[in-house]
Design a protein with these regions (language model features):
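Glycine-/small-residue-enriched transmembrane alpha-helix faces in small-molecule transporters
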Residues: 1-40, 47, 73-76, 84, ...
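Juxtamembrane helix-entry segments on the extracytoplasmic side of multipass membrane proteins
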Residues: 6-9, 31-39, 62-68, 140-161, ...
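Transmembrane alpha-helices of multi-pass small-molecule transport proteins
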Residues: 9, 32-80, 105-111, 161-165, ...
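Hydrophobic/aromatic residues within transmembrane alpha-helices
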Residues: 30, 37, 41, 88, ...
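Specific alpha-helical transmembrane segments that line the substrate/conduction pathway
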Residues: 36, 43-44, 86-119, 158, ...
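Hydrophobic transmembrane alpha-helices of multi-pass small-molecule transport proteins
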Residues: 49, 53, 72, 78, ...
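Specific transmembrane alpha-helical segments of multi-pass solute transporters/efflux pumps
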Residues: 50, 56-95, 101, 137, ...
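Helix-helix packing/entry segments at the starts of transmembrane helices
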Residues: 97-103, 169-189, 220-256
């Protein structure tokens, strides 16, 4: 990969991270259940990506059984990831949800060698632990059994499913277009979550519907497609550590848009996460393909 291509991939990845960071704001902005928010975003993401693929005259389904099964599995993982992510935000706080989710670089560093012919380098382990330390500083004192503790557990499970979804997509689906990959994952998640309509009424007010459309099309379909496109060009551990910037983006967005002022924990933890991300960025640009 040329230096120009690396820079383009890096910028696309960071823009995707900025957009995905905005997802957590919708947990506060949309007055609906976690299940309905997740179902709504998957439906509108699927519709948006389907129309895009048809407009570009691209296929919407894969031709091989293996790819379709992999896409189904990735879609299930994505649905669980989104549900547990928003549940973490509701149980604890948006900040805790984002920060526990971004233990996923640590998880990725240890999962990737299991499925790919590679071994984690000492630098990878150091950066992963640095990210974990940064996240640990950001999280206040725990008391098992309370909402904060349950929110953190939910966030950690969300991190695991996110890491495994990325691994499945990278290993089995990276030879396909990112929009097609994301469409099938979103469609699978939407079908899986459809039963929520039996116990949770579909919102009828324009505000909730409008925010769900925005979340599903721009902050999910577009953002995650761009993320997948960039991720396919990177090593999973590199993508994981570079994405550690997302908690910082989320804290800044919450500060600017919701008035949530970061405390000293957020500042110190954010600096450590930024430091790890900066080191990985320098390594990424120096790597020889």
């Amino acid at each position: 990969m040329s230096s120009e291509s690396k820079t383009k991939t890096f910028l696309e990845f960071q823009f995707a991270m900025l957009l995905i960071s905005g997802n957590i704001l919708f947990a506060k902005l949309i007055d609906e259940s976690v299940w309905m928010i997740t179902f709504g975003r998957t439906v509108f993401a699927s519709v948006g990506l389907y129309l895009f693929l048809k407009w570009r005259d691209k296929p919407v389904f894969f031709t091989t059984k293996t790819d379709n099964i992999a896409s189904l599995g990735a879609g299930v993982l994505l649905a669980v990831h989104w549900i547990t992510f928003f549940a973490s935000a509701r149980l604890a706080s948006p900040a805790v949800a984002v920060l526990t989710l971004f233990t996923h670089p640590v998880i990725t560093v240890f999962l990737e060698p299991i499925h790919f012919a590679s071994r984690p380098k000492k630098t990878d382990l150091f950066l992963a632990l640095l990210v974990l330390l940064g996240v640990g500083i950001l999280i206040p004192e725990l008391k098992p059994g309370n909402d904060l503790f349950l929110g953190i557990l939910s966030g950690l499970f969300s991190a695991f499913t996110f890491s495994y979804r990325n691994l499945v997509a990278k290993k089995f689906l990276s030879h396909h277009g990112s929009a097609q990959v994301m469409f099938l994952q979103s469609l699978t998640a939407a079908i899986l979550l459809a039963p929520v309509c039996y116990w949770d009424p579909i919102p009828t007010n324009y505000r909730s519907l409008g925010l769900m459309i925005l979340l599903g099309t721009f902050f999910t379909a577009f953002a995650h497609t761009l993320y997948m496109k960039s991720m396919f060009q990177l090593k999973l551990k590199t993508a994981g550590i570079l994405s550690s910037i997302q908690p910082v983006y989320s804290i800044l967005l919450a500060w600017i848009l919701l008035g949530d002022i970061p405390g000293y924990r957020e500042i110190i933890g954010g600096v450590l996460i930024l430091f790890a991300g900066t080191l990985e960025t320098i390594r990424y640009k120096k790597e020889v393909p």
